[in-house]
Swiss-Prot record:
InterPro entries cross-referenced by the UniProt entry: Bloc1s5 (IPR017243)
Protein name per the record: Biogenesis of lysosome-related organelles complex 1 subunit 5
Subunit field text: Component of the biogenesis of lysosome-related organelles complex-1 (BLOC-1) composed of Blos1, Blos2, Blos3, Blos4, Dysb, Muted, Pldn and Snapin.
Spans through the membrane: none
Pfam families named among the record's database cross-references: Muted (PF14942)
Organism domain of life: Eukaryota
Family, per entry: Belongs to the BLOC1S5 family.
Primary gene name: Muted
A cellular component annotation (GO) from this entry: BLOC-1 complex
Organism field: Drosophila melanogaster
Described function: Component of the biogenesis of lysosome-related organelles complex-1 (BLOC-1) involved in pigment granule biogenesis.
Length: 160
């Protein structure tokens, strides 16, 4: 009988932990948010920039090869195209360098982040207080049950 009561007590102790443990869900939501709004967007933008860089680089290589083999007025046009493609490649590289510059968060975003941190801290404090209340209540109930059980043993004259 005492073993069953302690098992019930242990199970009751685990209930608030199971009910209030939302870490897995919250972590999943945070990861999904980051995936949707940062990773995908940045990856696609960077990928497009690298594709443009590849295309411009291959055009520059092909133009320099064609200008080396070309003769006459065609060679002049190819030389002009070669310089224009070089300027275009420099512009793309400058754009890539500018895209890599880290942006600072706006004040509104920083304030919202701070407010979320404060709400989280308050929630954790309240949660800890709730846990302590449950633990104290559980300990009191355990003591009451132990007293009742020992009184019952005395009344029934059962040896321990």
């Amino acid at each position: 009988m005492k073993i069953m009561i302690s098992q019930v007590g242990r199970e009751l102790y685990k209930v608030p932990l199971r009910i209030l443990d939302h870490r897995v869900f919250v972590n999943g939501e945070i990861e999904a948010f980051l995936e949707n709004f940062e990773v995908r967007r940045n990856d696609s933008e960077v990928e497009k920039l690298f594709q443009v860089t590849e295309t411009v680089g291959s055009l520059k290589y092909d133009l320099s090869r064609c200008s080396a083999t070309g003769r006459g007025s065609g060679a002049e046009n190819l030389a002009q195209l070669d310089t224009e493609v070089s300027h275009l490649l420099d512009g793309v590289n400058a754009l890539l360098a500018k895209a890599k510059v880290e942006r600072t968060a706006s004040t509104q975003l920083q304030e919202a982040r701070l407010a979320r941190e404060q709400r989280r801290a308050e929630f954790l404090t309240n949660l800890e207080h709730g846990y302590r209340r449950i633990e104290n209540s559980f300990e009191e109930k355990e003591e009451e049950i132990a007293e009742l059980y020992s009184d019952l043993q005395l009344k029934l004259n059962i040896a321990k």
